[in-house]
């Protein structure tokens, strides 16, 4: 299976930033204009975009909708959005903006019944985001660690009809140390869900390893790449070639 690559834009106060391990105080501004960042991704061959409304994640309410709408309209990319999405109304608002998929995180722990209703209503437009540290789920914009195992939550979500999952190892996010490939692959194998790997991709080799697992039949749907692109570790065009989304000559 050829993986989808999702270059990431994290929005804080309308700007494109990256955090270290989810800490708002450790935000680095990479682009005053997120729309320009998205256009550059598109020019390099992207067809998808991962957007996190960081203000929304911490405030629990929409903050950057105007920017999200602009990103969709100006880039033409297929956009998935996470951050502070905790009601059916909010999901509907985002889908009406033109968002392809919404990522539910905290609400999967706090209100699984809502997830079930969301899946019944919006089907595969609903993706669950599981953020974990040492195998345990974190919620509220990563500020609070629970005693729930990532796999247990994934299996619970599968029971209510969820098919897609974004898995982030918080300890790796923004650190450029490489993703926790073993945990990601294990979660995909044991849950049977389509898993998008997130957090820590730092080298093209990380993407090669993930793509090799996908080629072996592991249900790895894709990977989210953030800081490595902004830091210049590799280009998006190079990353797309590794997963076969772009030919060698392009």
From Swiss-Prot:
This is 1-(5-phosphoribosyl)-5-[(5-phosphoribosylamino)methylideneamino] imidazole-4-carboxamide isomerase. It comes from Desulfitobacterium hafniense (strain DSM 10664 / DCB-2). The active site is at 10 (proton acceptor), 131 (proton donor). Its EC number is 5.3.1.16. Pfam families: His_biosynth. InterPro entries: Aldolase_TIM, His_biosynth, HisA_bact_arch, Isoase_HisA-like, Isoase_HisA-like_bact, RibuloseP-bd_barrel. The lineage of its organism: Bacteria, Bacillati, Bacillota, Clostridia, Eubacteriales. GO terms for molecular function: 1-(5-phosphoribosyl)-5-[(5-phosphoribosylamino)methylideneamino]imidazole-4-carboxamide isomerase activity. It is an enzyme of class 5 (isomerase). Gene3D superfamilies: Aldolase class I (3.20.20.70). It is found in: Cytoplasm. The keyword Protein biosynthesis does not apply. Keywords: Amino-acid biosynthesis, Cytoplasm, Histidine biosynthesis, Isomerase. One of its GO terms (cellular component) is cytoplasm. Belongs to the HisA/HisF family. Pathway: Amino-acid biosynthesis; L-histidine biosynthesis; L-histidine from 5-phospho-alpha-D-ribose 1-diphosphate: step 4/9. CDD domains: HisA (cd04732). It catalyses: 1-(5-phospho-beta-D-ribosyl)-5-[(5-phospho-beta-D-ribosylamino)methylideneamino]imidazole-4-carboxamide = 5-[(5-phospho-1-deoxy-D-ribulos-1-ylimino)methylamino]-1-(5-phospho-beta-D-ribosyl)imidazole-4-carboxamide. It comes from the Bacteria. GO terms for biological process: L-histidine biosynthetic process; L-tryptophan biosynthetic process.
């Amino acid at each position: 299976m050829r993986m989808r690559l999702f270059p990431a834009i994290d929005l804080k106060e309308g700007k494109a930033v990256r955090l270290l391990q989810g800490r708002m105080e450790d935000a680095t501004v990479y682009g005053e204009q997120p729309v320009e960042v998205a256009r550059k991704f598109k020019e390099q061959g992207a067809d998808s975009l991962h957007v996190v409304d960081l203000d929304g994640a911490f405030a629990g309410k929409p903050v950057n909708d105007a920017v999200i709408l602009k990103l969709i309209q100006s880039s033409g990319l297929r956009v998935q959005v996470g951050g502070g999405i905790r009601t059916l109304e909010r999901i509907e608002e985002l889908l009406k903006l033109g968002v392809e998929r919404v990522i539910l995180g905290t609400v999967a722990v706090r209100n699984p019944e809502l997830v079930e209703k969301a899946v019944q209503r919006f089907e595969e437009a609903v993706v669950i985001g599981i953020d974990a540290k040492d195998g345990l789920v974190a919620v509220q914009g990563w500020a609070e660690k629970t005693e729930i195992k990532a796999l247990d939550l994934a299996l619970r979500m599968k029971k209510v009809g969820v098919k897609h999952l974004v898995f982030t190892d918080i300890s790796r996010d923004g650190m450029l140390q490489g993703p926790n490939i073993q945990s990601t692959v294990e979660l995909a194998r044991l849950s049977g869900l389509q898993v998008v790997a997130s957090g820590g991709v730092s080298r093209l080799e990380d993407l090669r390893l993930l793509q090799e697992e996908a080629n072996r039949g592991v249900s790895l749907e894709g990977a989210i790449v953030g800081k490595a692109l902004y830091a210049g570790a590799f280009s998006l065009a190079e990353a797309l070639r590794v997963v076969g989304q772009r030919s060698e000559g392009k």
